[in-house]
């Protein structure tokens, strides 16, 4: 545990950062540049030639070819609201976002906050009255910024998926004071889905569709979002969505939460979501930032500190929803730009395999963003940084104790069996919340099967 003085300092620093969270202002289109209005539901996204939005056509083509050649199955570049080029051989089909789901989830949370259902500084005890003081005092903000301080390991979180991650979260002991330490946790995010349901009276997915996706023109059959064993929407990585619809979400973020004449998400929330914390200057509300001079990564048993921005050589106001193997929804306000990159890596950094959890560890993605942003002709490019010469810090495993924290067998078994200090007595792998596992599995298969059937039936709609 950190000292009381350190905790107070961290709290004050975080409060100062969030109180003065800047709201990014998208770059204004140069005189004579094309601008494209927001598409209506069912409409194709408007296009423009690169030169019409002050981008070098040859450089755009070269960047797109590079991205596709580096494993991208959907690479799209938008400027001033216009699609200026893409390489999307898979067509406009729903693609798995992995952890980029977290960023989309943060937009849904932002909509609920904007509508006044709860606030980011509300404590969990407001929604879970049975929580003990340790868990009750954790705030929504600390969940969004991955700084709850609760015990985290991958085996424990995987075990939680087979039981109930909300109950698991409320049973986990604290390793750190809330707000002081960044950990790239997974199951703790499930409490956000439950909070939306408790406060709005709607299923999380129904709320997301009604209040956010429908206003953006995203049809229900355009996405699939799986649930965990207990029926909670998997906010940590369970969404598959069409690249074009991800571009709509990216544009919403670029426009500080406005769409047409509606303020779907408060600009203040967007500003806080894209501002780092004392625990991790490179991470906002489930969103990765290029603004920090340093950032902490996804390593276990403790997140490693990097002494550089996440994307050296790219604009510092860049922020991104990021998922394993290189799923990106990236916004660059200073270039009035949205970039979509979905696919797989053709290069693996063996020195930092955990970096694959966000795709940022792959130098090809760093190179791609530099090429795309440097193609803008009305704003000087950032100084080039060769990503292939960058070295990553060593993994934080220095002995058997660290290895034990990574493997964490006692915690995982405790959760699966429903016994011990890490587990909820109401849930184990065979019986959870009054239901046997076959009932839960059948229900989940019906749910995701219905979504997949709907998505397959809609593949012929909204041709690009």
What are the functions of these language-model segments?
Residues 81, 94-121, 143, 192-196, ...:
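Active-site SXXK
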């Amino acid at each position: 545990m950190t000292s009381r003085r350190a905790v107070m300092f961290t709290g004050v620093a975080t409060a100062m950062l969030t109180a003065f969270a800047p709201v990014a202002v998208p770059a204004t289109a140069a005189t004579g540049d094309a601008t494209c209005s927001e598409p209506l539901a069912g409409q194709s996204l408007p296009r423009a030639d690169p030169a019409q939005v002050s981008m070098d056509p040859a450089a755009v083509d070269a960047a797109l070819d590079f991205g596709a050649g580096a494993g991208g199955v959907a690479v799209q570049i938008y400027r001033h609201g216009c699609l200026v080029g893409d390489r999307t051989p898979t067509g406009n089909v729903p693609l798995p976002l992995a952890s980029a789901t977290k960023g989309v989830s943060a937009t849904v949370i932002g909509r609920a906050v904007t509508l006044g259902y709860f606030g980011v500084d509300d404590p969990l005890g407001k929604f879970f009255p049975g929580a003990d003081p340790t868990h009750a005092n954790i705030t929504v903000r600390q969940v969004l910024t991955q700084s709850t301080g609760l015990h985290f390991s991958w085996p424990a979180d995987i075990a939680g998926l087979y039981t109930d991650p909300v109950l698991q979260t409320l049973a986990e002991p604290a390793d750190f004071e809330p707000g002081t330490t960044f950990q790239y946790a997974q199951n703790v995010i499930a409490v956000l889905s439950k909070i939306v349901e408790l406060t709005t009276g709607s299923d999380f997915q129904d709320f997301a569709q009604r209040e956010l996706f429908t206003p953006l023109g995203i049809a229900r059959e355009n996405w699939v979002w799986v649930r965990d064993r207990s029926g909670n929407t998997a906010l940590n990585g369970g969404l598959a969505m069409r690249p074009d619809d991800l571009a709509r979400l990216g544009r919403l973020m670029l426009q500080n939460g406005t769409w047409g004449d509606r303020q779907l998400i408060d600009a203040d929330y967007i500003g806080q979501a894209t501002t780092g914390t004392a625990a991790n200057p490179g991470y906002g509300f489930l969103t990765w930032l290029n603004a920090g001079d340093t950032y902490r990564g996804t390593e276990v048993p403790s997140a490693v500190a990097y002494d550089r921005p996440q994307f050296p050589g790219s604009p510092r106001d860049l922020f991104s929803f990021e998922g394993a193997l290189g799923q990106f929804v990236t916004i660059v306000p200073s270039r009035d730009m949205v970039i979509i990159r979905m696919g797989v890596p053709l290069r693996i950094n063996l020195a930092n395999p955990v970096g694959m959890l966000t795709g940022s560890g792959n130098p090809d993605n760093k190179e791609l963003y530099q090429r795309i942003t440097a193609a803008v002709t009305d704003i000087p490019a950032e100084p080039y940084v060769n990503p292939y010469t960058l070295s990553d810090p060593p993994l934080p495993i220095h002995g058997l104790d660290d290895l034990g924290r990574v493997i964490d067998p006692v915690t995982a078994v405790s959760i699966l069996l429903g016994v011990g200090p890490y587990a909820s007595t109401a849930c184990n792998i065979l019986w959870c919340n009054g239901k046997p596992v076959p009932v839960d599995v059948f229900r989940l298969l019906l749910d995701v099967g219905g979504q997949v059937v709907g998505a397959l039936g809609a593949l012929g709609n909204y041709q690009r």
